[in-house]
A protein has these predicted regions:
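Anionic-ligand binding patches
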Residues: 2-5, 13, 19, 42-148
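Short, structured coil segments at secondary-structure junctions
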Residues: 21-23
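A short beta-strand-loop structural module common to alpha/beta enzyme folds
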Residues: 25-36
Length: 148
């Protein structure tokens, strides 16, 4: 049994949290030729919870494939994705400061949800037939004060 996990996330905060908990992590980041951003495209009519769970599952599948392609030693792989939802509207990463100000204006004085999906995958080993995975969803309600 390995004494570390792979973290398939570019979030410095996720790595910091795991290290604070005493977890030994190895980063398992996408190759330059991987189109990781395309995994985050919102499907028409997709609800926020379904979206964040689907994206996390796709990221986990890509990370497990990356692990296999690179010939790295098998160990659990952790992936996560977080999104903000205002009603059924999924707020993606703002592409400009103007878009960021508009999003903050939309959130001002209102309640929104922060949804985080987490998935852990165990790669297929010699003794098992295939990889296994587990997932969870956390939903937090946040109320913004009025921004002026």
């Amino acid at each position: 049994m390995p004494d570390f996990i792979y973290l398939a996330s570019q979030s410095p905060r996720r790595l910091q949290l795991l290290e604070q908990w005493g977890a030994r992590c190895e980063l398992l980041l996408p190759d330059d030729q991987e189109d990781a951003e395309s995994l985050e495209a919102v499907l028409p009519g997709e609800a926020p919870a379904a979206y964040v769970q689907r994206v996390t599952a796709l990221k986990l599948a890509a990370a497990l494939d990356r692990l296999r392609r690179r010939g790295l030693p098998p160990a659990p792989v952790l992936c996560a994705d977080t999104t903000v939802a205002l009603g059924r509207r999924i707020l993606g990463k703002p592409q400009s400061s103007t878009e960021a100000r508009a999003m903050l204006g939309d959130l001002s004085g209102r309640e929104h949800r922060v949804l985080t999906a987490v998935a852990v995958g165990q790669p297929a080993g010699r003794a098992s037939r295939g990889s296994r995975s587990w997932s969870a969803l956390s939903v937090s309600r946040v109320r913004f004060g009025v921004l002026t």
